[in-house]
């Protein structure tokens, strides 16, 4: 299952990268993130592996993040893994002009279990809406004066 989203950001690409590249900021635009722990490699660099723990209501879950590509300041790719799916995310930051950057996110889910192969695609709208909310929170954070 694939989808792509775009969001214009009213800041320079360098400012966007600086905010995006700081894992402490991730907790601001992903408020359900409660812990980010790098287990191997250099955080944010290709080959780095981290465990991200989220809490949503009474439910707590973890994802393994593997950084697959980094080209500062225009691209950052990761794969998130759990027992149900691998989720590849390609983030690209394109200069529109000096103070505007377009954030493109290309997402692909590869479902692992039989049940998720059947029901996962029916949840595409939910995945898109959740991603749009996260992107919008990042926009509000990074554009704050």
Model-inferred region functions:
Residues 2, 73-75, 98-102:
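A generic structural signal for beta-strand entry/edge sites
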Residues 8-12, 53-57, 68, 94-96, ...:
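Solvent-exposed residues in well-ordered beta-strands and their adjoining turns
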Residues 1-40, 45:
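Hydrophobic ligand-binding cavity/cleft-lining segments
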């Amino acid at each position: 299952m694939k989808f792509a989203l775009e969001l214009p950001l009213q800041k320079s690409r360098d400012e966007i990268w600086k905010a995006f590249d700081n894992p402490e900021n991730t907790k601001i635009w992903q408020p359900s993130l409660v812990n980010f722990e790098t287990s191997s490699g250099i955080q944010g660099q290709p080959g780095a592996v981290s465990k991200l723990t989220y809490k949503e209501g009474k439910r707590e879950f973890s994802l393994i993040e593997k950084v697959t590509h980094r080209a500062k300041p225009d691209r950052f790719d990761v794969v998130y893994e759990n027992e149900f799916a691998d989720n590849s995310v390609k983030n690209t930051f394109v200069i529109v002009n000096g103070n505007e950057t377009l954030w493109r996110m290309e997402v692909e889910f590869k479902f692992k279990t039989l049940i998720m192969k059947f029901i996962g695609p029916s949840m595409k709208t939910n995945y898109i809406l959740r991603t749009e909310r996260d992107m919008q929170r990042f926009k509000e954070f990074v554009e704050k004066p």
